[in-house]
């Protein structure tokens, strides 16, 4: 069985400081007589003044401020997002349910992982006990998996709603099942990290690490699988779906579909897709340096001896953790409903003014879900009957309108002004499943 030092030197677990971060502050290099190419170290109870990686007080203060700001903004912002959706019936939609799941995962990651990991990286000593050691190795992968697959579920839902709107949408029960399945799969993926977590009490300090039965190669293989499953694969899926959706929404105007109601729907769909693309791109950018760091330090282990490696780790980890705080800011900037919700949440601030329009944005009544489903079905039937209107002698125009049905329910009603009530119902129901679109 590989030694703890060997495992740590090979590749630390997700959210763990690099070997240099553990070695630099509380240890000194081992004698150079060993021919092993991997970094090795001998723990010592106190850091000596000659340690080149010891953080000066001003650097510790700056890093502490940076990490503290991320945690404060991420936890507060995501809790407000959860409150906005759960406290207002109009916001309880399929897509917003996934946004709540995303916000919960991000808030938990920031609150339970960021500061603890920062302290461990900075001090090189584990202060939090064996149980939290297991949790600390286990939860980061779980939370990141839940976050990115919530985004993936939104991307697939948007794809189905825009590309094939006549197919049934996810019900509230189905949405809960999808969210539950995401967390179950996340737990299964992260379980080995919990199973192999160890605490080692040494003279002068305590270490928390993951000790794999077959050593560093098994550890590296596992983390490459994790990177593929929680980064590469979901980003590929979202890239494909949003590309197709973007081509559909921005590919040009549909001839004949020029009524105001349809144009409003199209504009709203473009806004929400743009917002979600920004969320996904932000996540990808924030986590990319972190993944690159671990891959490079695992392959080129001599990098762990570089005197600036601790700074590189702290910077890449801060950027990854900062991904948890950007989503609430994006929602507030790009969506009217969420902006109104944030104003209500911070109305106690003297410079925040909540207008009557903001109140109306969140309090406007909506149809009951069952009634929505029935109206949606009736509207589809009415729309189809309009397409095959026997009074229309222009077969080419009928054929065009039939194609428009698959593009958007609202376009059917606009292109055939059969009745005002049909147009109103169709346009409302086509966007009722996603309040983000309504408020964009």
From Swiss-Prot:
Top-level taxon: Eukaryota
Name of the protein: Neuromedin-K receptor
Residues on Cytoplasmic side: 83-92, 157-176, 246-274, 335-440
Pfam family, one: 7tm_1
One BP annotation, GO: positive regulation of flagellated sperm motility
GO cellular component, one term: sperm midpiece
UniProt keywords, alphabetically: Cell membrane, Disulfide bond, G-protein coupled receptor, Glycoprotein, Lipoprotein, Membrane, Palmitate, Receptor, Transducer, Transmembrane, Transmembrane helix
Topology, Extracellular side: 1-59, 115-134, 198-220, 297-309
Compositionally skewed regions (Low complexity) per UniProt: 420-434
Lineage of origin: Eukaryota, Metazoa, Chordata, Craniata, Vertebrata
